[in-house]
């Protein structure tokens, strides 16, 4: 995969080189470049200007963004504009991006963008219902979430398949050694070696956690008959005041 990031602060992306992104580069699975679009600004390196019609703040000018993208060697890139008004970023969207060969991220600053910049983009994406100073942190988050899904990047191909959201449910609780830590013990079922009982326990715990913390995820979840019965059991236990 090839990723190009347009930003006024390329140095902010240094931590990515020490994460899963750096490992993907070492394996030859990722080629990533950072472009300071101030270098392409014609007007005394000014990348922003006052909005027509008045108003507070400054807007990113179209020219530096257009010229930066036009010099990037890409055939059919997915061009993503980081915008608080965009569609929410999700695990499903990260999985979709992981199938692409070329991605371009545009990180904004100031009050917003000249609307004409949006004629370049294929996607307008938001990290959530809040506003950041710039798009860099959002871009780093999206790149990390996407790159780890590229085949062969993680040590085991199944490593991400049980992650929260990958299955549509939140992930079940997990434990490691020691068995007893300060009086807190590992659930006996996980020590049993009984694979089917462990599978059912994990599924029930995932359903319970999702029901309690993110019930919105269940609204469009495609339940199996087994999952539906387990959820009914969970609801009944909660109604009776059981853990």
Swiss-Prot record:
Its main location: cytoplasm. SUPFAM superfamilies: alpha/beta knot. GO terms for biological process: tRNA N1-guanine methylation. Signal peptide: none annotated. It is found in: Cytoplasm. Coiled coil: none annotated. GO terms for cellular component: cytosol. S-adenosyl-L-methionine binds at residues 108, 127-132. It comes from Streptococcus pyogenes serotype M1. Belongs to the RNA methyltransferase TrmD family. Keywords: Cytoplasm, Methyltransferase, S-adenosyl-L-methionine, Transferase, tRNA processing. Its EC number is 2.1.1.228. It catalyses: guanosine(37) in tRNA + S-adenosyl-L-methionine = N(1)-methylguanosine(37) in tRNA + S-adenosyl-L-homocysteine + H(+). Specifically methylates guanosine-37 in various tRNAs. One of its GO terms (molecular function) is tRNA (guanine(37)-N1)-methyltransferase activity. This is tRNA (guanine-N(1)-)-methyltransferase. It is an enzyme of class 2 (transferase). Homodimer. The keyword Transferase applies. It comes from the Bacteria. The keyword Cytoplasm applies.
